[in-house]
Amino acid sequence: MVSPVARWRKARGGGRVIPELPSSLVVEDDQIDLWWIDPREIQAPALLAALAGWLSAEEEARRGRFLFERHRHDFLIARGLVRGVLSRYTGVEPARLCFTTGPHGRPELAPELGAAGLRFNLSHTEGRAVLVVASDEVGVDVEASARTGDPVKIAAHYFAAAEVAALDELADDAARRERFFTYWTLKEAYIKARGVGVGLGLDNFWFDLGRCEASDVSAGSPGVDGWSTIAATGEQIRFAPGFADEPSAWFFTKMSFGTGFPGAIAARRLGRAAPTVRARAAALG
């Protein structure tokens, strides 16, 4: 039997949207799949037109509301990444994937797709789009660290006292900026995995950082199967008294997606061993 994805690929004239892989991907309970792309590298008009054909009417309307073309472009590539990758896990053609939202607006696959055990999360900034796929709650964040703003002032307003103190102890601006984005991406990944907004209170939880350096996902050496394994860096979350969560229920790791693009993943563990994170660059075209 020819899979829906294979039929779609044939109809598109054999165009490749992500690297050639088995027609159906499975993410195990102890595994997180991480996909990333630089939207600036995707410029072929025919490919952009094909990706636009995947968008729902609601997505096309959202895309049209961006004032600048570069932001419309980044949105298109990010949605193309989501639809192209998730089609490989669900067996559903990219344009036929349907989404719903949780109580706080987190996108989820629609129940009628029969993929209740599949979770995903997207993060994008100018220059990077990142998608994680897992079997339980998962969140990812990537930031462009060159953006303006005083990290210490932002941290003083939003972060826990322990994190503010740790930033104050650092000797130079570069170190403080790096540490700020480490904290910020970990916090964002956690609240996205929880499916809630910043109303959770970024000062209600903080992180003890691991001793390991963050892996540069963009510099990884893929194995014969095309995946690179990302080493866990050992971050631990701490909660304010009375906060309704348990530190041991969560796995965290920090990483980068090339110079100037720090990131982090948060995933629910539910008593299981720490998951394996494997990464792959998603090639469109």
Show where each model-derived region lies:
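Core catalytic alpha/beta fold that binds nucleotide/phospho-ligands
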Residues: 2-285
